Amino acid sequence: IQSLPLLALLALSGPGTSHAAVNQHLCGSHLVEALYLVCGERGFFYSPKARRDAEHPLVNGPLHGEVGDLPFQQEEFEKVKRGIVEQCCHNTCSLYQLENYCN
């Protein structure tokens, strides 16, 4: 039952279907399994950051203590938040999009 989303992804990505048309929510181990499937021997790039670092990139960054409450902080945070989890777990992604994370 744990691999059901991955099996659905495989079934829909068979011959005669467009890779870009198959969009799935893939989170946690399902996301990792899908990356192994898509990337194969090439492997994939995955470098998780600590939750604190992702939530407050400027506070924990090189300007720590110098930035204060500037209006651009929220904009910077939104840029940092984009990644494979944002793209494929919080939203949906296709096999084609997963390939962007392969080595």
From Swiss-Prot:
GO biological process, one term: glucose metabolic process
Localisation: Secreted
GO molecular function: hormone activity
Parts of the chain that traverse the membrane: none
Gene3D superfamilies listed in its UniProt record: Insulin-like
InterPro entries in the cross-refs: Insulin, Insulin-like, Insulin-like_sf, Insulin_CS, Insulin_family
Propeptide: 53-80
PROSITE patterns documented for this protein: INSULIN
GO cellular component labels: extracellular space
Superkingdom of the organism of origin: Eukaryota
Keywords: Carbohydrate metabolism, Cleavage on pair of basic residues, Disulfide bond, Glucose metabolism, Hormone, Secreted, Signal
Signal peptide start and end residues: 1-20
A Pfam family it matches: Insulin
Residue pairs linked by disulfide bridges in the UniProt entry: C27-C89, C39-C102, C88-C93
Subunit structure: Heterodimer of a B chain and an A chain linked by two disulfide bonds.
UniProt similarity note: Belongs to the insulin family.
UniProt protein name: Insulin
Taxonomic lineage of the native organism: Eukaryota, Metazoa, Chordata, Craniata, Vertebrata
